[in-house]
Regions:
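Short alpha-helical DNA-recognition segment
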Residues: 15-30
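A short, Lys/Arg-rich alpha-helix, primarily the initiator
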Residues: 1-14, 20
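Alpha-helical residues within the helix-turn-helix
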Residues: 12, 23, 51
Length: 69
């Protein structure tokens, strides 16, 4: 699942539109949709997005044996 698909799922689960998410993040819906189309999010973007939705964003590498680094 792409980051953009994950964001859409989060929005559905949080009962919020992507446009409303953008407004709460202090950006325009056009800007957020553009980032979603290009999959051009920074780690900071994703952390702020998660904070805006009241959830957490965890980043890690996962080795073939399932170990997270």
């Amino acid at each position: 699942m792409t980051i953009s698909e994950q964001i859409k799922v989060l929005c559905v689960r949080c009962n919020i539109s992507v446009a409303e998410l953008a407004r709460r993040m202090g950006t325009t819906p056009q800007n957020l949709n553009s980032k979603m189309k290009r999959e051009s999010f920074t780690i900071s973007d994703l952390e702020y997005l998660a904070e805006t939705l009241g959830c957490s964003f965890e980043r890690y590498f996962v080795l073939p044996d399932g170990e997270k680094i």
